[in-house]
Amino acid sequence: MSQIHKHPIPAAIAERCLITPEQYDAKYQQSVHDPDAFWGEQGKILDWITPYQTVKNTSFAPGNVSIKWYEDGTLNLAANCLDRHLSERGDQTAIIWEGDDATQSKHISYRELHRDVCRFANTLTSLGIKKGDVVAIYMPMVPEAAVAMLACARIGAVHSVIFGGFSPEAVAGRIIDSSARLVITADEGVRAGRAIPLKKNVDDALKNPGVTSVEHVVVFKRTGGNIEWHEGRDLWWSELVKKASAHHQPVEMNAEDPLFILYTSGSTGKPKGVLHTTGGYLVYAATTFLYAFDYHPGDIYWCTADVGWVTGHSYLLYGPLACGATTLMFEGVPNWPSANRMAQVVDKHKVNILYTAPTAIRALMAEGDKAIDGTDRSSLRILGSVGEPINPEAWEWYWKKIGNEKCPVIDTWWQTETGGFMITPLPGATELKAGSATRPFFGVQPALVDNEGNPQQGATEGNLVITDSWPGQARTLFGDHERFEQTYFSTFKNMYFSGDGARRDEDGYYWITGRVDDVLNVSGHRLGTAEIESALVSHPKIAEAAVVGIPHSIKGQAIYAYVTLNHGEEPSAELYSEVRNWVRKEIGPLATPDVLHWTDSLPKTRSGKIMRRILRKIAAGDTSNLGDTSTLADPGVVEKLLEEKQSIAMPS
């Protein structure tokens, strides 16, 4: 595999890069052999109120998982992203906002963003929100979403951003779990010309009898669409900030004070509230942003991720703003109203660094040269990829067509739980191979282990684990440290288990092969099969369901659901639509099954365990080697499923 074509470091990048190959080797060695010295130095990327003396205090030991970085230091995240830049670059653009409608865009300077954040911080305080309170944010991709997040950080409130594509039920579940006191939303969102009923979804979520903590809903007017109004509970954003002062003293936070909760899908049941704290997280977001994108002052940077995902937190907002960068926030989608929209935005705003997802790249690739019609993209210097492994064909297309064969593709592997990049090329230090995330970032110690946890040496394949902590690591799951230990540290002792498989080639480059647990990656978004199965089984006509992922040319994985109906119920076209809409309503559009496979029974072991391995193979049409079926209670089930599969229309 190491013989695959390598893309050399372009001369234009090598001339002015922040990290050379020699520097990478030296810094990496220092970072793993003396993390205190290395991260002690890197911590200076931020301004501290009380400087830290202790750098690393971490343990992955069973029953004693504890992660603390810079624990005696104090700082404020918003002050690091805004206040400290005012004297030197107050008039520089902090956020470029590009609307869904291309005629709408605006530039917000660091001074203006600081003013807006101070006003909203005072607004939050006037509503009784204080340090440690949880604020739920369910917003479209508008600058006010960033203002809300930064204002929470400024006063020490913990934000829980909920992706605008989630259903009222999913919103309610996240509010209940976090006991959020306030919800910040908009009347509607806008995406690909369609209105998204955000306020209505919040209203529906708050009707859930389990929601008892919410006192107010702050509503930003995005479209002016008709909405229900609950007097006393609902408050207009514009009216609140009008009354608020533009002066606000940021609250001094300990490095280990909670910053945000972000819910992510797990392999079992309900979503997990991943908790990140202030100091280590921001050091890590800023250093990874700086080095992985080879950021130079004046660069225009565009990360296409929604603020509702961790990529939006770390690499649309906090990493870039901590470094004083200009970050572009895009309300729309890359191929609307035409296939070349993404390329048009690059040209319009002279974007130098573009960070997007393989799903978007594959969708554009399917359009061929229409994706770049009438554009030259000559401003681009660095390309990035995030969300799932990128297949070599899509990588090469992205490099060739979008980047004009001159921009390194920074293929980043990381997770909600890692806070920032774990395995990634550095533009001036890494020769690239299409489809490989290449080598670990500073301080990251990956290993590949077999199913018993034995480390595998050299070129090999295995479960991807990390053997020591890094500053951006999640500290716990909100309100459930036991589940945190169980999920990430119990499979392999004294190691963080990512849930991903990977292989390492002869050059030490890592290739991520995908999830090894029951988690799907659909369009770069994680969905737990258990979550989708629970939604299916809650339908009154469904007895049992098993969900697997199948390869999909655009989305990476599509959702294939095996469904057993209750006795006396018959499959029909109406029920097919009803069940798909049911899941959409329970979780959100992302989780809608692409295929429903009606069946009378599922392959189970004698102990009643569903054999998902077999279901995955049948769904993918890979029937050459179904493996050992002798443990099945009824081996005949497999034949029947294969027969039924013949008549099922598959998504392209």
Curated annotation (Swiss-Prot):
GO terms for molecular function: acetate-CoA ligase activity; AMP binding; ATP binding; metal ion binding. Signal peptide: none annotated. The modification N6-acetyllysine is found at K609. Its EC number is 6.2.1.1. The keyword Cytoplasm does not apply. CoA binds at R191, A192, G193, R194, T311, N335, S523, R584. It comes from the Bacteria. Acetylated. Deacetylation by the SIR2-homolog deacetylase activates the enzyme. Its cofactor is Mg(2+). Keywords: Acetylation, ATP-binding, Ligase, Magnesium, Metal-binding, Nucleotide-binding. GO terms for cellular component: cytosol. It is an enzyme of class 6 (ligase). Mg(2+) binds at V537, H539, I542. One of its GO terms (biological process) is chemotaxis. It catalyses: acetate + ATP + CoA = acetyl-CoA + AMP + diphosphate. SUPFAM superfamilies: Acetyl-CoA synthetase-like (SSF56801). InterPro entries: Ac_CoA_lig, ACAS_N, AMP-bd_C, AMP-bd_C_sf, AMP-binding_CS, AMP-dep_synth/lig_dom, ANL_N_sf. The keyword DNA repair does not apply. ATP binds at G387, E388, P389, D411, T412, W413, W414, Q415, T416, D500, R515, R526. It holds the Pfam family AMP-binding_C. Belongs to the ATP-dependent AMP-binding enzyme family. Catalyzes the conversion of acetate into acetyl-CoA (AcCoA), an essential intermediate at the junction of anabolic and catabolic pathways. Acs undergoes a two-step reaction. In the first half reaction, Acs combines acetate with ATP to form acetyl-adenylate (AcAMP) intermediate. In the second half reaction, it can then transfer the acetyl group from AcAMP to the sulfhydryl group of CoA, forming the product AcCoA. Enables the cell to use acetate during aerobic growth to generate energy via the TCA cycle, and biosynthetic compounds via the glyoxylate shunt. Acetylates CheY, the response regulator involved in flagellar movement and chemotaxis. This is Acetyl-coenzyme A synthetase. The gene is acs.
